[in-house]
């Protein structure tokens, strides 16, 4: 049977295998002496039993179940279950593909499994592992063939092991035969491609990809077999083609324990495929052994060194990273690192961090665990800001509870920090000491109570946050403690003046007012009196006074009586402690009980008997009575009884006779002797207490006086009354009358003679003046001019009145002859030191005579201005008197003098060319006519309406011309180029009264006029004039000329300027800016006559006054008119010239360069020991003298009945000419408000000065602000301050919004400090919302105490000026409203200081006088007092010193 089967197998093999293929090795277990292949096998020594090699032939007596043949067999019934035995095939080491075949037999008669036949493949003598193939069960009594496709090649070797494992049934047989090795692929088992090693990092997933070739059976299973024997089933098998398939074996999260050798195994009943062993290499990611090292720490960074020299794990290291987190923090952040040091940025200050190093090797999951951490803390950082939200929680009189926002780490930036609450306040009073304290708060505190404060004090508090790295100070917030009862009034502050029946009592505010004093209470009562008629103690009386009334006059008191006064102050919290003082009234003169002079009781030639009545003592008893006899003289004025007429020195008759006196004491009576009325005979020849009463002379008249005296404590009071008159005897009466009449006639004749003498002197003076005027240069005979003082004279620019006593003026005036003889002038004031003498350097055109500057040398030749015979020059010293005479003279004055210019004129006129003329053409005189150079294109184009005018001792110094018309502009610039003019003076606006007065002959930027290019280089705008600088270039010329145009814009459209202050400053500016070697100054207005003539006359006369001390206005005007017709057009212009020259002479040059200011000012305030005055005081007196008082007609609008209630006081009214009329209409036709528009230095109408709004005028005030675009309001008085019956009330909302008539005012924001409260308001017209709103800042200045002329602090005032200036610049330069109580002194001081500071910034000049004078031209009460004027200088000095420190 076996043989038959073997034959079948052989045939099959021969059919399937190559014909020449023979096994390379194997065992057939046959007995043939020459086997096909060598057979090498062995049995394992550790088996439980041994395989049996059997040979069963036919006929052999064997169990029926066994097949015939030679093979290896195991009888399961002979072994115990679980026992096993192994057959070890020979060691194989093949170079190429090969196949191992074997036959097996598994049979049990009852069908049970005899056991399991397993096949193992051991590689290189390694562990056995698990079976690569096994078969169990009963498969019949036939042989089955299986194949092993082992893909292990040389140099590796392997062994195949067959294992028989006895089943629990242990019945049946297991057979094994024909183990053969063939050098061709297996047909029944797949061959695996080479399996490569797999390297992964620990914890990562590994995957073996097993590629197999062959025909896979349906029951084929694939496994990944570990060398240790563990099998892993395939996750999936993917067929690449019909003979190739891929099995994938994933290994999840492998670790070092999974590192081993693995191979692929396919199992099927027909055989198994086994791959080579591949290694699963598991690398441990690296980890540093030591933590990183800290190199440096900062608030927001840490610099570390990685310290990775020693590691745990496998390399190589391909990446280094830093992992850091807050200590015990939930987050971590990783940064890659390239160097050994690394800086961690953007860390939180004062925070502990854990920092570890991560190392990474190649491959996924190659990053190792973080190394040991470095635990380090960053430094603290400077706090981000100061604590916020500082506010009060509770305010009491002496303590303040504050609270603020709690602080978080994001603010402190450090866990170690401190909050300090610092506060300061001023004690006030005379000490003016500032208390400063800082209190350190407890950790986490957001509330604190400051104790032991003073009531009603501004407490300036700020919070300071500090940590080790810095500090942040919060903004200072001001709180005010509540009021308390006031402290006591200091007893030493009580001052008093006792009179007889009145006491003037004055006191000072308590040193500790502890709030706003609302009233004072004064109680008084009599406690002692030397007058027995006074009941003591008397009733107690009480009066109350307002807070600003710290004095009182107590009347109807008793003389000689001591009163006890108590004075105490009150706040809203009640009364404070009273101050006590005792004041005794003076005793009063006794009083008499005589209704009229009584009739004598009797009279003789030598005596007269009178009735003496006792007097009544007032405050003291009568001490003595006296009878006084006075001889009546003819011319003596009649004595009226009174205390001043009494006789204080007792004179006996003998003493009076010896001294030649007319009165004597006839008797002295003790008070006790006259207790009731009694008769007394004057002249009874008796002696009374040492006084002889001699008989009276019959021929003389006598007046009899009765005198009573009271003496008390060194005081004496007298009262006397005339009680009788004794006439002379009748026979002596006629001679007396004749004598009286003779004396009266003599007096009349004396008065007449004196008047005649004065008249003769006056006529003599006039004759001398006329004779002196006949000389051609009459003014050269005048006394040598002297430095002119600013004499205090009353002067009104436009309305100068005659002095009250003309005769006295004439008497005081010295004639020219007398001045020459005496060598005197009213200017030679003792101790006068003119300002100019203090300056260093030479005299320039800007430093004129005025103010005593040294006169420049004057030549005589070449001057065209000659004094006439009937119109001689007037000395500067006599100019005021001359103007007064000319304005008030009835026969000959300015009117007649002006009209004389037109008498006998031969106005030869040249026919005007069309392009040069105007509607009323003005012809120029040929001799002085300016001729233009002819042009090639038009040789006749040489005419221009312009004339040369001489200056003072300077020929052709001016060119007077008309304002250019469009067709005349090119000729105008031709003339400027031809004459090399450096200055153009323009005294007109382009359009006036709706008519074009002058064409705009200059460009906005640059333009060509013919062949001349004009470029505007610079524009400087001031309040009353504009200076434009032009560059002139002409085609064909290489030269470039610079020309300045001085455009005076303040000349009114009608008449003349109200004041000359601005025009005089303008003339000085032109003089100073024109180079001495330049060509003529071109001057034009509209027609080139009236205004132009005024300018030239003023320029010339200022030079003449400076050089010679005289002015000759009349002849100067006459000479000008000979050069150009109608140079002075109106009498008003002629008078204005005189007034302007007078103002210049009186005021002088008051400008000081800033580099000379300190030294000059020091000299100005020096007190002259002779005059006990200073230059500064004299300058202020000059300012007062030239300040024009307002007439009633000038304030006609303010005086209208409907406007009276809009004025706080009728003494301070704005003139009509500078009123800002209200524009917004609220239905009321009245558009008046008590306010005045005034100039600053650089801007016209820059200020609006007004008074503190009344309750009824508050809507008008806000209309004024809105209508005139006022962006700043400066408040210089305090609320509730009142010098009148009108209180100063708050006129703004705070907070919120409020409607004031048409205007809605909304509070936007506010800030405050100890000097200034600043508020921002939004103002809009509620009836015209489409116009938008106006943003206004309100500056309430706190450092100007009531009843003080000047602010408390110059520094604070400068701060106010700076803040206003800064806001004005930010808000677009709107107007500024300035107000105080009455719109006078304080407001004027502010405007003057602002003007002076502008002057310093623009031109480095200081001129306080000019600033004050300009303001007073609008309102005479501006800069009212000497202290305020002095303060303006101090502010300028403080400002300049502050600039030096920058």
Swiss-Prot record:
GO terms for cellular component: cell-cell junction; plasma membrane. InterPro entries: ConA-like_dom_sf (IPR013320), FN3_dom (IPR003961), FN3_sf (IPR036116), Ig-like_dom_sf (IPR036179), Ig-like_fold (IPR013783), Ig_sub (IPR003599), MAM_dom (IPR000998), Prot-tyrosine_phosphatase-like (IPR029021). The chain crosses the membrane at residues 750-770. The extracellular domain is proteolytically processed through cleavage within the fibronectin type-III 4 domain. In addition to the 190 kDa full-length protein, proteolytic products of 100 kDa, 80 kDa and 73 kDa are observed. Disulfide bonds join 210-264. Keywords: Cell adhesion, Cell junction, Cell membrane, Differentiation, Disulfide bond, Glycoprotein, Hydrolase, Immunoglobulin domain, Membrane, Phosphoprotein, Protein phosphatase, Receptor, Repeat, Signal, Transmembrane, Transmembrane helix. Substrate binds at residues 1053, 1085-1091, 1129. Residues 888-1144, 1176-1439 form the Tyrosine-protein phosphatase domain. Residues 25-188 form the MAM domain. Residues 1-18 form the signal peptide. Residues 190-275 form the Ig-like C2-type domain. The keyword Kinase does not apply. The active site is at residues 1085, 1380. The modification Phosphotyrosine is found at residue 865. Residues 19-749 are extracellular. The modification Phosphoserine is found at residues 848, 853, 863. Transcripts of different sizes are differentially expressed in a subset of tissues. Detected in brain, lung, skeletal muscle, heart, kidney and placenta. In brain; expressed in olfactory bulb, cerebral cortex, hippocampus and cerebellum. It catalyses: O-phospho-L-tyrosyl-[protein] + H2O = L-tyrosyl-[protein] + phosphate. One of its GO terms (biological process) is negative regulation of cell migration. It is a single-pass type I membrane protein. Glycans are attached at residues 75, 410, 685. Residues 288-383, 386-484, 485-591, 592-668 form the Fibronectin type-III domain. Residues 830-867 are annotated as: Disordered. Tyrosine-protein phosphatase which dephosphorylates CTNNB1. Regulates CTNNB1 function both in cell adhesion and signaling. May function in cell proliferation and migration and play a role in the maintenance of epithelial integrity. May play a role in megakaryocytopoiesis. Belongs to the protein-tyrosine phosphatase family. Receptor class 2B subfamily. This is Receptor-type tyrosine-protein phosphatase U. It comes from Mus musculus. The lineage of its organism: Eukaryota, Metazoa, Chordata, Craniata, Vertebrata.
């Amino acid at each position: 049977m076996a043989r038959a089967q073997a034959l079948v197998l052989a045939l099959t093999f021969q059919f399937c295998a190559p014909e020449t293929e023979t096994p390379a090795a194997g065992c057939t277990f046959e007995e043939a002496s020459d086997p096909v292949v060598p057979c090498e096998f062995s049995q394992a020594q550790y088996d439980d039993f041994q395989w049996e090699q059997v040979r069963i032939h036919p006929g052999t007596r064997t169990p029926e179940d066994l097949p015939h043949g030679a093979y290896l067999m195991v009888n399961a019934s002979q072994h115990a279950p679980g026992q096993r035995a192994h057959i070890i095939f020979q060691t194989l080491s093949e170079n190429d593909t090969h196949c191992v075949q074997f036959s097996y037999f598994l049979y049990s008669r009852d069908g049970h499994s005899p056991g399991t036949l397993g096949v193992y493949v051991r590689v290189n003598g390694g562990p056995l592992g698990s079976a690569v193939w096994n078969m169990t069960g009963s498969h019949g009594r036939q042989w089955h063939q299986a194949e092993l496709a082992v893909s292990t090649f040389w140099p590796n070797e392997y062994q195949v092991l067959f294992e028989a494992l006895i089943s629990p049934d242990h019945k049946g047989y297991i057979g094994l035969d024909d183990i053969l090795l063939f050098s061709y692929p297996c047909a029944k088992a797949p061959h695996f491609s080479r399996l490569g090693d797999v390297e992964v990092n620990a914890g990562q997933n590994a995957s073996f990809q097993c590629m197999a070739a062959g025909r896979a059976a349906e029951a084929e299973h694939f496994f990944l077999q570990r060398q240790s024997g563990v099998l892993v089933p395939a996750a999936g098998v993917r067929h690449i083609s019909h003979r190739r398939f891929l099995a994938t074996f994933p290994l999840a999260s492998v670790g070092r324990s999974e590192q081993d050798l693995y191979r692929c195994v396919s199992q099927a009943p027909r055989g198994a495929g086994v791959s080579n062993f591949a290694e699963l290499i598991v690398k441990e990611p690296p980890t540093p052994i030591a933590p990183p090292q800290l190199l440096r720490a900062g608030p927001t960074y840490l610099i570390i060194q990685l310290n990775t020299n020693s590691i745990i794990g496998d390399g190589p290291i391909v990446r280094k990273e830093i992992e850091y987190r807050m200590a015990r923090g939930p987050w971590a952040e990783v940064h890659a690192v390239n160097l050994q040091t690394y800086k961690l940025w953007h860390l939180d200050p004062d925070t502990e961090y854990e920092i570890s190093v991560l190392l990474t090797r190649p491959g996924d999951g190659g990053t190792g665990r973080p190394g040991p951490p470095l635990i380090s803390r960053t430094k603290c950082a400077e706090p981000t800001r100061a604590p916020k939200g500082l506010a009060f929680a509770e305010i009491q009189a002496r303590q303040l509870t504050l609270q603020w926002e709690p602080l978080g780490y994001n603010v402190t930036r450090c866990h170690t920090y401190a909050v300090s609450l610092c506060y300061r306040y001023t004690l006030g009073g005379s000490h003016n000491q500032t208390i400063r304290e800082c209190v350190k708060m407890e950790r986490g505190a957001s509330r604190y109570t400051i104790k032991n404060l003073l009531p009603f004090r501004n407490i300036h508090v700020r919070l300071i946050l500090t940590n080790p790295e810095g500090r942040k100070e919060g903004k200072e917030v001001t709180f005010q403690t509540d009021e308390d009862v006031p402290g006591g009034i200091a007893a030493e502050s009580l001052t008093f003046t006792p009179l007889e029946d009145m006491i003037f009592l004055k006191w000072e505010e308590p040193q500790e007012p502890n709030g706003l004093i609302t009233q004072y209470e004064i109680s008084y009562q009599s406690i002692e009196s030397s007058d027995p008629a006074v009941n003591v103690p008397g009733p107690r009386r009480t009066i109350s006074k307002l807070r600003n009334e710290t004095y009182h006059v107590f009347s109807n008191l008793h003389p000689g009586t001591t009163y006890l006064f108590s004075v105490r102050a009150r706040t809203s919290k009640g009364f404070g402690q009273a101050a006590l003082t005792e004041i005794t009234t003076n005793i009063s003169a006794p009083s008499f009980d005589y209704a009229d002079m009584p009739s004598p009781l009797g009279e003789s030639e030598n005596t007269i008997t009178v009735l003496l009545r006792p007097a009544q003592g007032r405050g003291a008893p009568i001490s003595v009575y006296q009878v006084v006899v006075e001889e009546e003289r003819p011319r003596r004025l009649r004595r009226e009884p009174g205390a001043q007429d009494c006789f204080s020195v007792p004179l006996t008759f003998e003493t009076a006779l010896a001294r030649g006196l007319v009165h004597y004491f006839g008797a002295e009576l003790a008070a006790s002797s006259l207790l009731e009325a009694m008769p007394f005979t004057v002249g009874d020849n008796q002696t009374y207490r040492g006084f002889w009463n001699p008989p009276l002379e019959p021929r003389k008249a006598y007046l009899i006086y009765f005198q009573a005296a009271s003496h008390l404590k060194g005081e004496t009071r007298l009262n006397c009354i005339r009680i009788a008159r004794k006439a002379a005897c009748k026979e002596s009466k006629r001679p007396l009358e004749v004598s009286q009449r003779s004396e009266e006639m003599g007096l009349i004749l004396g008065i007449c003679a004196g008047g005649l003498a004065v008249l003769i002197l006056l006529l003599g003076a006039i004759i001398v003046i006329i004779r002196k005027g006949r000389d051609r240069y009459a003014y050269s005979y005048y006394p040598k001019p002297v430095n002119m003082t600013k004499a205090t004279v009353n002067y009104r620019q436009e309305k100068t009145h005659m002095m009250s006593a003309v005769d006295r003026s004439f008497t005081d005036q010295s004639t020219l002859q007398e001045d020459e003889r005496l060598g005197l002038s009213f200017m030679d004031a003792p101790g006068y030191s003119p300002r100019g003498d203090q300056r260093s350097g030479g005299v320039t055109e800007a430093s004129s005579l005025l103010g005593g500057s040294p006169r420049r040398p004057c030549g005589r030749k070449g001057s065209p201005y000659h004094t006439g015979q009937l119109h001689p020059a007037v000395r500067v010293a006599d100019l005021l008197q001359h103007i007064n005479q000319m304005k008030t003279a009835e026969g000959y004055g300015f009117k007649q003098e002006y009209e004389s210019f037109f008498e006998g004129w031969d106005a030869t006129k040249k026919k005007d060319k069309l392009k040069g003329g105007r509607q009323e053409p003005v012809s120029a005189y040929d001799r002085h006519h300016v001729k233009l150079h002819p042009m090639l294109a038009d040789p006749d184009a040489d005419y221009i309406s312009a004339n040369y005018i001489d200056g003072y001792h300077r020929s052709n110094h001016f060119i007077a011309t008309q304002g250019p018309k469009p067709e005349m502009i090119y000729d105008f610039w031709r003339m400027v180029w031809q004459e090399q003019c450096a200055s153009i003076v323009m005294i007109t606006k382009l359009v006036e009264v709706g008519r074009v007065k002058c064409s705009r002959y200059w460009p906005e930027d640059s333009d060509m006029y013919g062949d001349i290019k004009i470029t505007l280089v610079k524009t400087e705008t001031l309040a009353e004039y504009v200076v434009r600088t032009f560059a002139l270039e002409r085609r064909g010329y290489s030269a470039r000329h610079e020309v300045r145009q001085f455009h005076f814009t303040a000349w009114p459209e009608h008449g003349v300027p109200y004041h000359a202050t601005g025009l005089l400053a303008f003339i000085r500016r032109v003089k100073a800016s024109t180079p001495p070697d330049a060509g003529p100054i071109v001057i034009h207005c509209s027609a080139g006559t009236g205004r132009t003539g005024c300018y030239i006359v003023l320029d010339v006369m200022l030079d003449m006054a400076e050089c010679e001390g005289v002015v000759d206005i009349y002849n100067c005007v006459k000479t000008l008119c000979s050069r150009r017709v109608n140079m002075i057009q109106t009498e008003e212009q002629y008078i204005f010239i005189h007034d302007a020259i007078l103002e210049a002479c009186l005021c002088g040059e008051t400008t000081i360069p800033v580099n000379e200011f300190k030294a000059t000012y020091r000299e100005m305030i020096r007190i002259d020991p002779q005059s006990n005055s200073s230059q500064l005081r004299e300058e202020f007196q000059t300012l007062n003298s030239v300040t024009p008082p307002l007439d009633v007609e000038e304030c006609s609008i303010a005086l209208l009945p409907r406007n009276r209630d809009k004025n706080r006081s009728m003494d301070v009214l704005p003139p009509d000419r500078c009123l800002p009329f209200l524009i917004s209409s609220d239905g009321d036709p009245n558009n008046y408000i008590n306010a005045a528009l005034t100039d600053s230095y650089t801007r016209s109408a820059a200020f609006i000065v007004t008074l503190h709004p009344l309750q009824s005028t508050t809507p008008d005030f806000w209309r004024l602000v809105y209508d005139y675009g006022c962006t700043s309001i400066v408040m210089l008085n305090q609320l509730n301050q009142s010098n009148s019956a009108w209180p100063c009330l708050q006129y703004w909302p705070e907070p919120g919004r409020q409607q004031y008539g048409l205007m809605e005012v909304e509070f936007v924001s506010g800030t405050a400090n100890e000097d200034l409260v600043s508020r921002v308001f939004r103002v809009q017209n509620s009836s015209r919302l489409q116009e938008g709103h106006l943003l206004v800042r309100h500056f309430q200045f706190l450092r100007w105490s009531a009843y003080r002329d000047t602010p408390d602090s110059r520094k604070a005032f400068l701060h106010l000026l700076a803040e206003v200036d800064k806001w004005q610049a930010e808000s677009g330069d709107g107007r500024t409203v300035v107000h105080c109580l009455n719109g006078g002194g304080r407001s004027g001081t502010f405007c003057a200081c602002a003007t002076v500071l502008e002057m310093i910034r623009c031109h480095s000049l200081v001129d306080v006088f000019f600033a004050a004078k300009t303001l007073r031209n609008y309102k005479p009460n501006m800069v009212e007092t000497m202290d305020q004027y002095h303060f303006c200088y101090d502010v300028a000095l403080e400002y300049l010193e502050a600039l030096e420190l920058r």
